């Protein structure tokens, strides 16, 4: 017997998707603080920075926009941790693809910050998992971070 595909809806707690999702940033994020730093890939930062600025207005202070360093590595995370604007933020906004988002997630864990992900490509699951994958600077696998 052949079964037709069924439509199933899954709701992830803390997951917002859709054309108006940026309009919900303030409501979703302000319970976690008033200052956010944005970490991401250079192209992703260029694509999303103005949209994030408009969405948060004066409700969330953006302490800075910083490239993640091109590799989700412990070395890049240590470098980001040394930036005063990162240390002063209450939250981390991780913008981009998988490695940029993983960098933001592990940075948040290392600095005891809440993070929010803003995927700019559809092919990454990094935005909806707690797993972060770290690499050595040469791109070889280093470890998984949970």
Residue ranges and their predicted role:
Residues 22-23, 45-49, 74, 99-106, ...:
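Short glycine/serine/threonine-rich phosphate/pyrophosphate-binding segments
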Residues 6, 58, 77-85, 103-111, ...:
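Noncatalytic linker/hinge segments flanking ATPase motor cores
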Residues 67-71, 95-97, 124, 145-146:
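Short C-terminal domain-edge/linker segments immediately following a structured domain
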Residues 1-91:
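ATP/NTP phosphate-donor binding region
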Residues 84-122:
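A short, small-residue-rich loop immediately preceding and capping a beta-strand
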Residues 13, 109-146:
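A glycine/threonine-rich phosphate-anchoring loop and its flanking beta-alpha core
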Residues 14, 37, 92-94, 100, ...:
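Short glycine- and Lys/Arg-enriched binding-loop motifs that mark or flank ligand-binding interfaces
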Residues 19-20, 41-42, 95-97, 118-121, ...:
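Fold-independent oxyanion-binding glycine-rich loops
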């Amino acid at each position: 017997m052949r079964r037709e595909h069924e439509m199933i809806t899954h709701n992830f707690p803390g997951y917002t998707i859709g054309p108006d999702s940026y309009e919900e940033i303030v409501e979703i994020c302000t319970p976690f603080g008033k200052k956010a730093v944005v970490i991401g890939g250079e192209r992703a930062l260029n694509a999303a920075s103005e949209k994030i600025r408009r969405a948060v207005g004066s409700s969330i202070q953006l302490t800075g926009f910083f490239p993640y360093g091109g590799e989700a590595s412990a070395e890049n995370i240590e470098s980001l941790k040394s930036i005063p604007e990162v240390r002063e933020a209450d939250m981390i906004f991780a913008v981009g693809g998988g490695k940029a988002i993983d960098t933001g997630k592990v940075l948040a864990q290392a600095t005891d910050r809440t993070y929010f992900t803003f995927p700019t490509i559809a092919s990454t699951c990094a935005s909806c998992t707690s797993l972060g994958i770290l690499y050595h600077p040469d791109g070889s696998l280093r470890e998984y971070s949970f």
